[in-house]
């Protein structure tokens, strides 16, 4: 069975939600502790949402320096699929696995709603089951989701098809309506909205989030 690691930092909130989404996709979630460098031989890693280390210094900055991230950086450079959700996206940027940074929302308010996203790239491990330009609905909740990068970085992301999702109604001021991006290899994806909160009709946010986890399963099955 496919085994997907779900990291828990001090202040992580959504690790259990991510684990449930993994189970619904047919894989086994494996808990990974922030203070350990052992990735337990998992096939992929999820950095879930929350407020790691209370967002002190900068959101994701202290988590980026934790022992588990040293192992994840090496593994990601070797091709391990990694998904960073909300605070996990912030950690990926602070770890320099993804470029840019996430700043306070443009209106300086915490934002919580179901967001419509447009799929901008299906050429990643985590989006290969979506259709190009497909519009999906994913829950979002963040106070520091305003994606910012210098002009050269944004131009490179656009030119190399590394913008993965865009907001259709930008809730936070992110440059170019960017909701998520990927690395050059397409194995590391970060986004602010929460696909793990959009996997069951019961929650009211639909099931479009399952596409992330099913995409991973499709990718891994093709590697066998």
From Swiss-Prot:
GO biological process, one term: 'de novo' IMP biosynthetic process
Every Glutamine amidotransferase type-1 domain range: 3-224
A GO molecular-function descriptor: ATP binding
PROSITE patterns: GATASE_TYPE_1
Record field: catalytic activity: N(2)-formyl-N(1)-(5-phospho-beta-D-ribosyl)glycinamide + L-glutamine + ATP + H2O = 2-formamido-N(1)-(5-O-phospho-beta-D-ribosyl)acetamidine + L-glutamate + ADP + phosphate + H(+); L-glutamine + H2O = L-glutamate + NH4(+)
Record-linked Pfam families: GATase_5
Compartments, as annotated in UniProt: Cytoplasm
Pathway info: Purine metabolism; IMP biosynthesis via de novo pathway; 5-amino-1-(5-phospho-D-ribosyl)imidazole from N(2)-formyl-N(1)-(5-phospho-D-ribosyl)glycinamide: step 1/2
Assigned GO CC terms: cytoplasm
Active site (record annotation): 86 (nucleophile), 194, 196
Annotated keywords: ATP-binding, Cytoplasm, Glutamine amidotransferase, Hydrolase, Ligase, Nucleotide-binding, Purine biosynthesis
Protein name: Phosphoribosylformylglycinamidine synthase subunit PurQ
Its biological purpose: Part of the phosphoribosylformylglycinamidine synthase complex involved in the purines biosynthetic pathway. Catalyzes the ATP-dependent conversion of formylglycinamide ribonucleotide (FGAR) and glutamine to yield formylglycinamidine ribonucleotide (FGAM) and glutamate. The FGAM synthase complex is composed of three subunits. PurQ produces an ammonia molecule by converting glutamine to glutamate. PurL transfers the ammonia molecule to FGAR to form FGAM in an ATP-dependent manner.
NCBIfam families: FGAM_synth_I, PRK03619.1
Keyword Hydrolase assigned: yes
Assembly and interaction partners: Part of the FGAM synthase complex composed of 1 PurL, 1 PurQ and 2 PurS subunits.
Keyword hit for Ribosomal protein: no
EC numbers, comma separated: 6.3.5.3, 3.5.1.2
């Amino acid at each position: 069975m496919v085994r997907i690691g779900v990291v828990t930092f001090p202040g992580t909130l959504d690790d259990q939600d991510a684990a449930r989404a993994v189970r619904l996709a047919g894989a086994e979630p494996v808990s990974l502790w922030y203070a350990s460098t052992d990735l337990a031989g998992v096939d992929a890693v999820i950095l879930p949402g929350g407020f790691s280390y209370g967002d002190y210094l900068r959101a994701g900055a202290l988590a980026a320096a934790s022992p588990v991230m040293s192992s994840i950086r090496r593994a990601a450079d070797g091709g391990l699929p990694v998904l960073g959700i909300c605070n996990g996206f912030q950690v990926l940027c602070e770890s320099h696995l993804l470029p840019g940074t996430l700043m306070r929302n443009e209106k300086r308010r915490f934002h919580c709603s179901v967001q419509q996203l447009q799929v901008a790239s299906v050429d990643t491990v985590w989006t290969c089951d979506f259709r190009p330009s497909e519009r999906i609905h994913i829950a979002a909740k963040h106070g520091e989701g305003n994606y910012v990068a210098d002009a050269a970085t944004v131009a490179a992301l656009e030119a190399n098809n590394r913008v993965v999702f865009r907001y259709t109604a930008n809730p936070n001021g992110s440059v170019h309506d960017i909701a998520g991006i990927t690395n050059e290899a397409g194995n590391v994806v970060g986004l602010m909205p929460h696909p793990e909160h959009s996997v069951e009709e019961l929650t009211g946010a639909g099931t479009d989030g399952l596409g992330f986890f099913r995409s991973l399963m499709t990718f891994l099955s093709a590697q066998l």
